Design a protein with these regions (language model features):
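Position-specific recognition of the canonical hydrophobic site in helix A of tetratricopeptide repeat
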Residues: 36, 66, 73, 100, ...
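Terminal, low-structured helical/coil segments at or just beyond the last alpha-helical repeat
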Residues: 240, 244-276
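Canonical tetratricopeptide repeat
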Residues: 63-67, 101, 135, 169, ...
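Short coil turns that delineate tetratricopeptide repeat
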Residues: 56-59, 93, 127, 161, ...
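Helix-start (N-cap) detector for alpha-helical repeat units in TPR-like alpha-solenoids
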Residues: 25-26, 59-62, 96-97, 130-131, ...
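N-terminal leader/linker segments that initiate helical-solenoid repeat arrays
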Residues: 18-67, 74, 276
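Structural signature of tandem alpha-helical TPR/SEL1-like repeats
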Residues: 40-46, 75-87, 109-121, 143-155, ...
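A conserved position within tetratricopeptide repeats
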Residues: 52-56, 89, 123, 157, ...
Length: 276
């Protein structure tokens, strides 16, 4: 984030004389940048707000509001960050960067309907915005609007054939839609691009498990653990697989290993009771 902040604020500084002969605005931006370089987030925020107060209605201040919002997100002050992004969009309602920032924050806050509004507005401005396509597809999938989710994922894969997250999302969506052949085709492409991606093996293992092809499922789960032996989620997945074909001792051992690696002891204990 810091690099992007500095680049855009340097742009503001370069343009400031054209906006106003008053140098106070530019001086405050310089001070804010120095505070940011020193990682003094609260101080930087205070100074940027002082700069905004000098020129509150200027479109340039939309950028400052945006970065105040980003600083607040870093401090987990989400409601205040949302307020800053709202002010930024009042000054620059078609800013793609701020729309994306606000959409991302709304997703973090569990406000998917608000995020969806911003993503749709952003994609109206720029139909090929990759990040917006991905997050809108994700929200559509969560809302069980699978046709809309598929359209966004497919558009994104056309734009970025090596977009791992989009292909993975499309594979999972196809599997959910009971289109197993298409799901496996997307998995094959993923493994062609990323042959050592543990997550892809785990996902394919889960697909085989749903089809009760336990031998292939176990092969993929083992491969995922071989590639990422410190990932507790993979041990939980393999434990659940062992449960399916009544290997209770092996399932219990994997649950315990997952706890050792940081998984929730309470959740794993509940699953272990079912396995014993």
């Amino acid at each position: 984030m810091r690099k992007a902040v500095l680049v855009l604020l340097l742009f503001l500084l370069a343009c400031a004389p054209a906006w106003s002969q008053d140098t106070e605005y530019a001086e405050l931006i310089k001070k804010g940048m120095k505070a940011l370089e020193a990682d003094s987030l609260s101080k930087a925020e205070t100074i940027f707000l002082q700069a905004i107060a000098v020129k509150p209605a200027d479109k340039a201040s939309a950028v400052l509001y945006q970065y105040v919002g980003q600083l607040r997100v870093r401090q987990e002050r989400h409601k205040e960050a949302l307020e800053a992004f709202n002010y930024a969009l009042q000054l620059a309602p078609t800013s793609q960067e701020v729309l994306m920032d606000r959409a991302s924050l709304n997703i973090q806050m569990g406000r998917e309907s608000h995020a969806l509004n911003d993503l749709c507005d952003l994609l109206t401005l720029n139909p090929e915005h990759a990040e917006a396509l991905f997050f809108r597809a994700y929200i559509y999938a969560e809302q069980h609007l699978n046709a809309k989710a598929r359209a966004d994922y497919e558009r994104l894969v056309i734009l970025q054939p090596r977009n791992r997250e989009a292909r993975l999302g499309l594979a999972l969506l196809c599997d959910k839609d009971r289109r197993p052949q298409e799901a496996m085709e997307h998995i094959d492409v993923l493994l062609r691009y990323w042959p050592d991606d543990a997550t892809v093996y785990a996902v394919r293992g889960g697909m085989y498990q749903k089809r009760r092809n336990y031998e292939l499922a176990l092969r993929d789960m083992n491969r995922a653990i071989e590639l990422e032996p410190e990932n507790p989620d993979f041990y939980i997945s393999r434990a659940l697989l062992y449960k399916d074909f009544h290997k209770k001792a092996l399932a219990t051992a994997d649950f315990r290993k997952a706890v050792d690696l940081g998984a929730s002891a309470q959740e794993c204990a509940s699953m272990m009771l079912d396995a014993e």
